[in-house]
């Protein structure tokens, strides 16, 4: 890549290796490449966060307040790309969905997925009827327990679903770690994990609403 500022070889980094100017982002770079990471599910989130914070400091708007238009635009575009990559890779389910979409495209098999959320990483896949029935019954049980004021039952339901979610994500991690990942099986596990995650989020929101009726 040729640097827009010094017109010399800028290298592959965020900053020109010669003059230090921020370079426009590579539109073809995936979220892993943004952080210079290998494309895999198992990441050290602490290291990822440290890298993210270091990069955001370099791209902080105050550093470009008096820069020319090209420098400000490059830093803004880099920031957008960086934040999107961070939001996706820092969350296990989102990271798994994104990695699955990359692996599926590379294998030439979309696994029935159509990217739909802001990170382009949430897939639409057939949902097992038994899973839908299970989650519906869990929601009904949670609602009834709340109406009765059965705190122990609510806690047990939430703990059970959390355990199910964690089990599915453990299977997802194992699936990606396999020598030849079964993408369809990983996708099915992720569907279940998302449904369990949604239940937990709804349960938490409902609990907060009861604590603060205003």
Label every PLM stretch briefly.
Residues 1-214:
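C-terminal accessory/regulatory regions appended to core domains
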């Amino acid at each position: 890549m040729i640097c827009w500022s010094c017109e010399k070889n800028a290298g592959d980094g965020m900053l020109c290796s010669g003059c230090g100017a921020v370079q426009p982002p590579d539109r073809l770079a995936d979220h892993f490449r943004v952080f210079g990471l290998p494309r895999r599910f198992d990441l050290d989130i602490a290291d990822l966060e440290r890298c993210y914070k270091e990069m955001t400091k370099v791209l902080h708007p105050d550093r470009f307040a008096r820069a020319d238009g090209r420098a400000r635009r490059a830093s803004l575009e880099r920031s957008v790309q960086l934040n999107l990559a961070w939001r996706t890779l820092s969350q296990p389910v989102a990271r798994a969905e994104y990695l699955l979409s990359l692996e599926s495209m590379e294998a030439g098999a979309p696994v029935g997925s159509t990217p739909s959320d802001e990170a382009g990483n949430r897939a639409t896949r057939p949902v097992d009827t038994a899973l839908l029935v299970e989650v519906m019954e869990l929601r009904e049980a949670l609602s009834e327990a709340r109406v009765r004021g059965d705190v122990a039952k609510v806690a047990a339901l939430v703990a059970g679903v959390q355990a199910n979610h964690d089990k599915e994500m453990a299977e997802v991690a194992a699936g990606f770690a396999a020598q030849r990942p079964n993408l369809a099986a990983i996708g099915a596990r992720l569907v279940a994990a998302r449904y369990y995650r949604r239940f937990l989020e709804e349960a938490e929101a409902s609990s907060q609403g009861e604590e603060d009726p205003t």
